[in-house]
Amino acid sequence: DSDSYSKQQLDDLFMDMIAYYDGDPKRIQHFTKVHSYARLIGIGEELDDASLFILEAAAYTHDIGIRVAEEKYGRCDGKLQEQEGPIIAQKMLSQLGFENYIVERICFLIGHHHTYDNIDGLDYQILVEADFLVNLYEDDAGNRAIDKAYKRIFKTETGKKIFRLMFGYEED
């Protein structure tokens, strides 16, 4: 039922993530943008309510492992984010009353969002596309990286459309 997928829980999670990244506006801006694109693509691809809810929560929390990775290892590459993130997210999501099966899927997505060769669902595909849309811009990617990302990563019609418009990209 749609009560399980409450807007209030997502808003509470948004505030908790802002607090989690206290003093780090760049990371707050990043997950906010990833969430916006993830939601837009999810709606465009007609995700069911449960999948959209999971996607939105995963978009807010996808990089939650960064801080711990930096503290423990002095760096925060994708693999370390995937390794450290789920534990922190599991605690935060459970405290906010997210149901177990939802927490499990979100933690799976956090633990795999830099792994592109075994995408097992539309929620996962869209999270990766949204993260790429934001990262390509934030990292000031060149034309080769943009071309490669489009061909290798983007599968949804909505994600491809946003990509083409954002980067003025024309398919071969």
Where on the chain are the PLM-derived regions?
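Divalent metal-dependent phosphate-bond-processing catalytic cores, especially two-metal-ion Mg2+/Mn2+ enzymes
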Residues: 1-5, 22-32, 36-48, 61, ...
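Active-site flanking loop/helix segments enriched in acidic
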Residues: 9-33, 65-75
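A general alpha-helix detector
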Residues: 16, 37, 88-92, 129
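Short amphipathic alpha-helical interaction patches enriched in hydrophobic/aromatic residues
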Residues: 21, 42, 68-72, 93, ...
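An active-site-proximal "capping" alpha-helix that borders the catalytic cofactor pocket
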Residues: 34, 79-95
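His-Asp-centered metal-binding catalytic motifs of divalent-metal-dependent phosphohydrolases/nucleases
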Residues: 52-74, 85, 107-114, 131
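Mid-chain, well-packed structural core segment of small domains
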Residues: 92, 96, 104-109
